[in-house]
Regions:
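A charged, aromatic-enriched C-terminal amphipathic alpha-helix characteristic of glycosyltransferases
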Residues: 2-10, 329-362
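Short hydrophobic patches on amphipathic alpha-helices
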Residues: 96-97, 120-121, 261, 324
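Proline-aspartate-enriched helix->loop->beta-strand connector
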Residues: 96-104
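A short, histidine- and acid-enriched strand-loop-helix "catalytic/donor-clamping" loop
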Residues: 127-144
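Short, charged, surface-exposed secondary-structure boundary motifs
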Residues: 139-143, 190-195, 322-324
Length: 370
């Protein structure tokens, strides 16, 4: 019997070739590579897009294997205490062989070598490589220059790039043929607060930093947002502000951020750089997704997604000041717009819809952002 079994196995192996693909394309295997933030004790858990993407992929029925590149390198240093990039490449390739993913989805890394991506393609010619980046890419902003450079490391090699700014702005800096816009998602388990149902004592919330990898502010940094906030405070000094990263108040993170958020009726969605079509930091998910009435410059063109009964647009700082004063005193209309805004945000850009959009583009299906 054993000899017959061996013969049958040999016949099967000779007749049926091995294809290195996942036949059930409705259920994909995805490696999601991003910084999980062990070094910072997970203080960024509530603003981590990588975490939201994992949640969205899983809730859409896919399997996800998470890899934290920076944590691996930090935890696997050589005897000289230098991160061992070579070991990380070996780890990635062996993990890839064991898991055999359909998609490698990675963001904000420079730790994956092009040769490693080449190896992935050699192992599985059907692999789909996608890069995402949530930071600003407007060429006029000094901060963006390094970010664009980081994106360009992989942009021509991967199948798809996803950014939080209208890709048209990159017309002269990269080949944008494989670039797609995505909206910062909200997640029902993360943006879980309904501030419009509460009784906040402060009027206006704003939190900024000099980069999420720094817990504190840098000295000697010029920031247009500081100038804007100073002018705003001078125009309406009677408003009860709750600003962080401003006027010698350090940034706040994690649960401290949420505890501060619920104390304000309204939030200012002011991102670094000039107002640019569709770009917002993930601040918008935190304030709008948690039910604060949200103010945003009309030049960001969010009116393509939201109307005046869901978010408050302003043309300039004078109009912003007037509207802050008005809505701070008119509770019913403030609550109504804040509720509408959160509802619309979750309808259009929740974690399952955004990750479905990623998958549709990756598989060449008809894709719609909303």
């Amino acid at each position: 019997i054993n000899e017959n079994t061996k013969i049958l196995d040999q016949i099967r192996e000779g007749c049926v070739p091995f294809f290195n693909i996942n036949f059930n394309k409705k259920k994909l295997k995805i490696i999601n590579l991003y910084n999980q933030g062990q070094k910072s004790n997970h203080r960024l858990y509530n603003i981590s897009l990588g975490k939201k993407f994992t949640n969205g992929f899983v809730r859409n029925g896919h399997d996800v294997l998470e890899v934290s590149d920076r944590d691996f390198l930090r935890n696997n240093k050589s005897f000289s205490l230098i991160p061992n990039r070579s070991n990380f490449q070996t780890f990635l390739i062996n993990t890839f062989k064991n898991y055999n993913p359909d998609i490698l989805f990675f963001g904000h890394t420079k730790n994956v070598e092009i040769n490693t991506l080449d190896s992935f393609k050699s192992i599985n010619k059907n692999i789909i490589l996608s890069q995402w980046n949530e930071d600003p890419v407007m060429p006029s902003l000094n901060y963006s220059k390094q970010n664009i450079s980081n994106i360009k490391l992989y942009s021509d090699f991967v199948d798809h790039n996803f950014i939080t700014t209208d890709p048209l702005i990159l017309n002269k800096t990269v080949n944008r043929n494989n670039f797609n816009f995505f909206f910062v998602p909200v997640d029902k388990n993360i943006e879980s607060l309904d501030v419009y149902k509460m009784k906040p004592k402060k009027d206006l919330f704003y939190a900024m930093s000099h980069g999420v990898n720094r817990a504190i502010l840098k000295e000697g940094i010029e920031d247009d947002r500081i100038n804007f906030l100073n002018r705003l405070v001078n125009k309406i000094p009677d408003i009860k502000y709750d600003f962080y990263g401003f006027a010698n108040k350090q940034p706040i993170w994690g649960n401290d951020f949420n505890n501060a958020l619920i104390n304000s009726k309204m939030g200012l969605n002011l991102s670094r750089g000039k107002p640019t079509k569709y770009y917002s930091s993930n601040r918008i998910a935190s304030i709008m997704g948690n039910g604060l009435l949200t103010f945003i410059d009309e030049k960001v063109q969010m009116n393509d997604f939201f109307n005046k009964n869901e978010i408050i647009f302003y043309k300039n700082i004078n109009e912003l000041a007037d509207k802050i004063k008005y809505y701070s005193k008119n509770e019913k209309v403030r609550i109504k717009i804040a509720r509408n805004g959160k509802k619309k945000y979750f309808k259009l850009f929740n974690e399952t819809k955004i990750t479905k959009y990623f998958i549709d583009i990756s598989l060449g299906n008809k894709a719609s952002l909303f």
